[in-house]
């Protein structure tokens, strides 16, 4: 039995957002095909994690060094530890997120900030940083209304590329992606584009 963490970074409904359609399609297919796995859903907009700042940075640093924390640092470090522990303990992690203004939603960036901790998800070596999450399986589900996989807009895609870079930095080797793109650029083909992407997500979930 695997422990699977589903992370959703969009507070719109499935009727409003393609990335939420992707999330629900993958989740439902996964549940159907892996009925014995333990699933944890993390809705980042519902969680509304505070931005990474002084108290969290100082608190986690001091805790790692065995130093005394003040009350604000303890509270901030506890939040950071909770998200990090949940991620580390998961055998598989699924992220669903849109491309907004060329990047990930701020709430997802904040969440990733909490995951990036030396000595846990990566470590420093004389040869450079080394990821420590090599045994984790990750799926990235991304939706963007325009075409960003190639052509002049490719250099402006900092959503999926950001998440792929972070997961690679963490040492994740078993990385899968499903992307739905162009449904706003070509509205006449939108339904077909979305349906094909959802079918791909369901297929991946069945074997994930």
Curated annotation (Swiss-Prot):
Transmembrane segments: none annotated. Its cofactor is FMN. InterPro entries: Flavodoxin_fold, Flavoprotein-like_sf, FMN-dep_NADH:Q_OxRdtase_AzoR1, NADH:quinone_OxRdtase_FMN_depd. It catalyses: 2 a quinone + NADH + H(+) = 2 a 1,4-benzosemiquinone + NAD(+); N,N-dimethyl-1,4-phenylenediamine + anthranilate + 2 NAD(+) = 2-(4-dimethylaminophenyl)diazenylbenzoate + 2 NADH + 2 H(+). Keywords: Flavoprotein, FMN, NAD, Oxidoreductase. Disulfide bonds: none annotated. SUPFAM superfamilies: Flavoproteins. One of its GO terms (molecular function) is oxidoreductase activity, acting on NAD(P)H as acceptor. Its EC number is 1.6.5.-, 1.7.1.17. Binds 1 FMN per subunit. NCBIfam families: PRK13556.1. Homodimer. Belongs to the azoreductase type 1 family. HAMAP family: Azoreductase_type1 (MF_01216). Quinone reductase that provides resistance to thiol-specific stress caused by electrophilic quinones. This is FMN-dependent NADH:quinone oxidoreductase 1. The gene is azoR1.
């Amino acid at each position: 039995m695997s422990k699977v963490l589903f992370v959703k970074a969009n507070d719109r409904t499935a009727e409003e957002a393609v990335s939420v359609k992707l999330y629900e399609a993958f989740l439902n297919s996964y549940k159907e095909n892996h009925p014995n796995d333990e699933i944890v859903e993390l809705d980042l907009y519902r969680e509304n994690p505070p931005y990474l700042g002084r108290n969290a940075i100082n608190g986690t640093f001091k805790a790692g060094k065995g130093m005394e924390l003040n009350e604000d640092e303890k509270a901030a470090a506890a939040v950071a530890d909770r998200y990090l522990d949940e991620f580390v303990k998961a055998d598989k992690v699924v992220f669903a997120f849109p491309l907004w203004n060329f990047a990930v939603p701020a709430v997802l960036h904040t969440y990733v900030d909490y995951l990036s901790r030396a000595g846990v998800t990566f470590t420093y070596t004389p040869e450079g940083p080394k990821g420590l999450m090599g045994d984790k399986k990750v799926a990235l589900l991304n939706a963007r209304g325009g075409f960003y996989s190639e052509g002049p807009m490719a250099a402006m895609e900092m959503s999926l590329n950001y998440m792929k870079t972070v997961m690679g930095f963490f040492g994740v080797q078993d990385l899968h992606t499903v992307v739905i793109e162009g449904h706003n650029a070509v509205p006449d083909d939108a339904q077909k584009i979305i349906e094909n992407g959802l079918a791909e997500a369901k297929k991946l979930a069945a074997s994930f």
